[in-house]
């Protein structure tokens, strides 16, 4: 990293290892694409300061690939380059790999589902001048921290990055389904609320290790944006946006649900009282 960015030797080793050296961005196919991208970008970014090199790299990405919706598994960064097309998740995989190929820490972030409409989006973040900044992948702007999704992301209930294995999270872990973990990055984009949820028995005894799913209505289905377990005090905390969430809590054969508006409340107690959740009909505020 000293050879490429002489003025950026302050990049922490952990960030460099996790967001430059590491080979994977998300669930994409893996090929040896970095030497190919480096050969294309080396002269183009030579002599530039780090931020200017980031912006120039994104211009190159826009020249090489454009958006096209797909439904298959996320293709490799090299496949996006050779095909010239990819959905937002694939464009961001491509852009992150291009940036990593020239020694710039980069990662993918995404809103798994928007709160205000039926859709989602993924983009990139880069480490520059001591902090993380965002950019639209293959959607170049003249400055960092600007993109068409700025207003949309400000209404989000969750935006997250992904880490693998023993990599250290730089925020609250919102789910840990397998060898990967989702990390909450929402505070960079939206006003947030720390929603405290307490799960108790009917007599008020805290329920430890209850499964809690925080869900968002999108495409006529409830989609989990975070899954956690209650602690020994029956408590779980989620940093989220301002809007409506469907919360589902269960332990063994007991289950309770609720719809919470985080614009009005920041704490709620739910009681595990029965074997099945009662059906309810309420409005979601988006």
Language model: regions and residue ranges:
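Short, ordered, surface-exposed loop/turn motifs in non-cytosolic proteins
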Residues: 202-221, 242-243, 286
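Hydrophobic/aromatic-rich core segments of domains that either
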Residues: 39-59, 64, 68-78, 82-175, ...
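A short, solvent-exposed beta-strand micro-motif common in secreted/extracellular proteins
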Residues: 243-254
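Linear, non-domain "peripheral" regions
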Residues: 1-48
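A short, amphipathic beta-strand motif
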Residues: 193-203, 282-285
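Conserved "repeat-terminator" motif of extracellular CCP/Sushi domains
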Residues: 188-190, 270-285
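Short, acidic Ser/Thr/Gly-rich low-complexity loop/linker segments typical of extracellular
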Residues: 218-240
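Structured interaction patches on ligand/partner-binding surfaces of diverse proteins
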Residues: 252-277
